[in-house]
């Protein structure tokens, strides 16, 4: 090597391995308004100090690597490194703690949820010094929020499009979710919408299979929507699942839905990914479509208490990436959801400003700076007896989705839809009159059965159905 091209180490460089905490544990650091803040539940290997484990998380999810490198001298680590700035114990867990990490905003590409996750959780979860790691929450700074479009329409625009106010929206997933022909599927959609539902839904398992290709389903569902609208005088919709094996195919399905004039399409945002979801959300905004989001695969990521990622993080990411509805559990049905925690991330989806509240699992105050809100969808094992609790828990800005609780009605799909609509209207009226839904809910439903035989039949069928299992998370 000639003298002109030879590169020598600077005087300050010293090769070798040193503790992460010497560089990345900074308890005196004052967080900035522009920092992305993360709360990790850390379970270190035996013998690894909390400060070292927290610093390792900060390092490996930002600028650090396992050994000192001479190119550190070519940049400013103080400007770009993540910092573990606080550690606190987890009540009742001697081997776990919460590590708070601050990331400079310059580490992240504008408007890119996928790269935010690539940086923060992409590599560090396999780190050998940790037995387990869970991302509990993120604080997204206003400066970064403003680089995202968010939901294609938002709650208020959706209500204006549908001309429906003052109550939750009602939906239904068509069952059986697999095996119906397109024509029979469309018939079920029509019956449910005619009976009083606002929406029906493709199950996430439905895309384009030999028994029902997507184009045929879209056509028969559109026919059902227009027929039900003509008969009821209400705007109706069906969540047409645009999820596909390629982004090109996904967009083709969304374009066809727009050409049919239907109001809403659907997407499985976790299985397909944030890049595809953001692309579809942008198309929906530009073309006046609502976007319903299913969270298929979420429990693979969020169900374990000490490893993975809490759903509140996935919910925040969805609001940034774009979606007008997202499934959020029920609290009372067959799918998991503890009340305070569920309402914590429901508020993160809907509200513009949310205060820190650890009792609801909210680690950071979050300001969405007018990013449109997302309607939470309560779905899974719910029926008419749950209506008072669902109305009281989720309030007006929600979608209450009854699949088996509609199509399982002994008289058929349309009477099942009637039963749900009557139950909802009764609960909303009782609430508006000042009655206590939590205490008087069953009485309110029984009173409504006197003038709705459809509701009376539904109440008789599901009077003994309960799903009583403890929640996994707290």
UniProtKB/Swiss-Prot annotation:
Subunit organization: Heterohexadecamer of 8 large chains and 8 small chains; disulfide-linked. The disulfide link is formed within the large subunit homodimers.
PTM summary: The disulfide bond which can form in the large chain dimeric partners within the hexadecamer appears to be associated with oxidative stress and protein turnover.
Role this protein plays: RuBisCO catalyzes two reactions: the carboxylation of D-ribulose 1,5-bisphosphate, the primary event in carbon dioxide fixation, as well as the oxidative fragmentation of the pentose substrate in the photorespiration process. Both reactions occur simultaneously and in competition at the same active site.
Cofactor note text: Binds 1 Mg(2+) ion per subunit.
Active site: 175, 294
Record keywords: Acetylation, Calvin cycle, Carbon dioxide fixation, Chloroplast, Disulfide bond, Lyase, Magnesium, Metal-binding, Methylation, Monooxygenase, Oxidoreductase, Photorespiration, Photosynthesis, Plastid
Residues recorded as bearing N6-carboxylysine in the entry: 201
GO molecular function, one term: magnesium ion binding
Location of the protein in the cell: Plastid, Chloroplast
Protein name, entry field: Ribulose bisphosphate carboxylase large chain
Cofactors (names): Mg(2+)
Catalytic activity: 2 (2R)-3-phosphoglycerate + 2 H(+) = D-ribulose 1,5-bisphosphate + CO2 + H2O; D-ribulose 1,5-bisphosphate + O2 = 2-phosphoglycolate + (2R)-3-phosphoglycerate + 2 H(+)
Record-listed Mg(2+) binding positions: 201, 203-204
Site (Transition state stabilizer) residue list: 334
Any Pfam family: RuBisCO_large
Record family assignment: Belongs to the RuBisCO large chain family. Type I subfamily.
Residues bearing PTM N6,N6,N6-trimethyllysine: 14
Signal peptide bounds: none
E.C. number: 4.1.1.39
One cellular-component annotation, GO: chloroplast
Residues with PTM N-acetylproline: 3
Propeptide: 1-2
Positions bound to substrate: 123, 173, 177, 295, 327, 379
Other comments on record: The basic functional RuBisCO is composed of a large chain homodimer in a 'head-to-tail' conformation. In form I RuBisCO this homodimer is arranged in a barrel-like tetramer with the small subunits forming a tetrameric 'cap' on each end of the 'barrel'.
GO biological processes: photorespiration; reductive pentose-phosphate cycle
